[in-house]
Amino acid sequence: MRTLLVLALTVSAWFFNTESAHAWGRIGHDLAARVAAHLVSESTSKPFYKSRAMDLGYYCNVPDLVWKKTHYDIEWTNHFMDLEIFNREFKKRIEEGKLSPKEDPYEMTRAAFNTKFSNIPDNAGRGYWRVRELEKRLQATADLLKQKDILKEERHRLQLEWLIVAGVIGHYITDLAQPLHVTENYDGQMTEQKGVHSHFEDTIVDQLWPSIDMQVYKEADRLWEKERGAMAGKTSLALMKELSDSSLKELDEILKRDKKTPRDDLKKAVEVYRPIVVRRLAAGAVVLAEIWRRHSNWVPNEDKFYAFSGEPAYIQPSVPPPTPTPAPSPTPKK
């Protein structure tokens, strides 16, 4: 009995440590989704998206707050991309003549990629694939909503499905907007800065709220006006890669500021990080808005549409990891 208790406590401790870091926390994910809803509503002249901003903000938190509770082993690797690991392997294969410089391995399906690049484990991240798989589902739902002869009850069911899938896509997109979610040095463990992950995305963002809200809205409006035309001509994968690359470029600055700023001096720390947080949340919201916009060409029926799901059913990845993939150390992993 004692052995079982010790084992249970050990597993619980591992689970708590590996799950403890959520990109942007509740506030950041919710804010980015609400901003995206505003952008889509304005650009499509459909108030439906703005009126459902609360719903979308909630669903944007579902992958962390709901799905990780029941499907952690197959879910957690979908929340990040350790880009350095991928880049090193791609470069090596190009040098060995095993990969053409013109090939983009990210365009492969999850199953094909896992087969060809079996030495890049799931715990290096599968965020790009998660978004693309869910976007296919969002498109299928949008296609059904375009039909004109659907009964009201069925249309409402499909509208709820659209909101849920769109919202959870938002979670993975905004994960990619977080610099510490696109690097193997995700918690500063490689630079003797453990704890920087939750300090940046949880503590700092929580302290910045609510003053940060309007700043993110304004920055997103500016970016949307500037980039929306160019974004419309790019694939979702291209948008994700650009978003992740821009996130990675902010990493050194975050680590530098962390070393210079005492974490317990929150009054100073929040102002040190404010510009970066605003930029990253706005960048994520804009990419998310463009993805939603592509699947918004249908007419909502808002007549007594009160549907809401507190705990949406888990949506499986196309290829779940063959066996549970524990985090490599007690250090929090996205």
Model feature map: region roles:
Residues 176:
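SAM/dcSAM-binding transferase cores
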Residues 21-164, 168, 179-334:
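N-terminal, motif-rich segments that launch catalysis or mediate targeting to/interaction with membranes
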Residues 5-16:
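Bacterial N-terminal signal peptides
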